[in-house]
Amino acid sequence: GSGQNENAGILVSAAQFNPALPIRDENGNYSMNSDASFLPNPVSLLDITDKTTQERLLANAFFEVRPIDGLLLKANFGIDRNYQKLKQYLPTTTLYGQRENGAASIAQGDNSDYLMELTANYTKQVGDHNFNALVGHSYQLFTYEMFSGKSNDFITDGFLYNNLGAGNAKRPTVGSSATKSRMASFFGRLNYTFKDRYLLTATLRADGSSNFASGERWGFFPSVAAGWRFTEEEFLAPLRNVLSNGKLRLSYGETGNSNVGDKAYSYYKVGNNNIFGNSMINGVYLSQLGNNVLTWETAREWNVGLDLGFLDGRVNVTAEYYHKVVSDLLNEQTLLSYNEVNKIIANVGKTQSQGFELTINTTNIRNKDISRIDR
């Protein structure tokens, strides 16, 4: 009778309801199973009015300019906005609606992600040497707003969810929340190749997140990768009819995670557990201790790989070994029970993983009309 079955769907209720019972009893009401009074009549759920709307806006705009040869300046702006609204009414003909004498609810949420990215990309070739350098800055803003209202004990089902004030509930439920977080990044990347044979890439990122306290907001994450396309060497030229591609790769990189929400160092809640006279009064309480030294979770990974292609790409083999360590794991930590507030978000430890992966792709049939690839 708590409303879960009304919201779970007709099929769930139909699977659990006694099929020997008629749809309606002798009084014209929906029949109920006396042995399972918590199960609603599945046909009665058709009387529920449930309307959900969703609006989503995905937009992106960019500007490019080439002030000199080889230099590209680009500004990119994007938005991802998702708005949802749910309106529901459980009439007195349903099990839960009858117990609540009609129950109405409205909820709406607005989730937005704004992005600005500015980059400068420079490419230069000097003989057999190719250089590409990129520097940039990005800024992201995440916002979320939610509102909900519920009421019950209506004199008639005719209002549906259009007049919550018509309900005679002793304590109508009203809720709202809002969150905002920001991410700023500065990054750079340098690519170098020599004769398309030796390859080197180095990157550096500095990411700042408002999810952490002011002294711990910035994390620095470097990476470097080197490659050798050995099939371009002259001493392997006689084998190119068989070994069409061969590349050895080695890389090391660091990435960061700040996904802890925006309340990791300041978290309060509102509860109605304060009794004054015959009334319960809302109050604010600390539900989670703040952590001013909380910092980025960092993943460090080594990777060694070998790519081989045979018979003009008809057979391709990739072998990789990786070793990954994730340190300063972000997680909720339970404190000793005698603390009045016994929860805190902390950097709790680290994990380690390693493994070997082997992938083989073969193109068994390839012509202008059809191709077949097996893996």
PLM regions and their residue ranges:
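Charged, amphipathic alpha-helical segments characteristic of ABC-type P-loop ATPases involved
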Residues: 24-26, 30
